[in-house]
C-alpha cells in the first residue's frame, strides 16, 4: 500500500 495515500486518508478522516 502507498504510505502517502494512507496518510492522506488519515488526514481526511481527522479534518
From Swiss-Prot:
Glycans are attached at residue 2. One of its GO terms (molecular function) is carbohydrate binding. Keywords: Glycoprotein, Hemagglutinin, Lectin. Induction: Hemagglutinating activity is inhibited by polygalacturonic acid. The keyword Transcription regulation does not apply. Belongs to the leguminous lectin family. Heterodimer of a 29 kDa and a 31 kDa subunit. Trypsin-stable lectin with hemagglutinating activity. Has mitogenic activity on murine splenocytes. Inhibits HIV-reverse transcriptase. This is Lectin 31 kDa subunit. It comes from Vigna unguiculata subsp. sesquipedalis.
Amino acid at each position: 500500500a502507498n504510505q502517502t495515500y494512507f496518510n492522506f486518508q488519515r488526514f481526511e478522516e481527522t479534518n
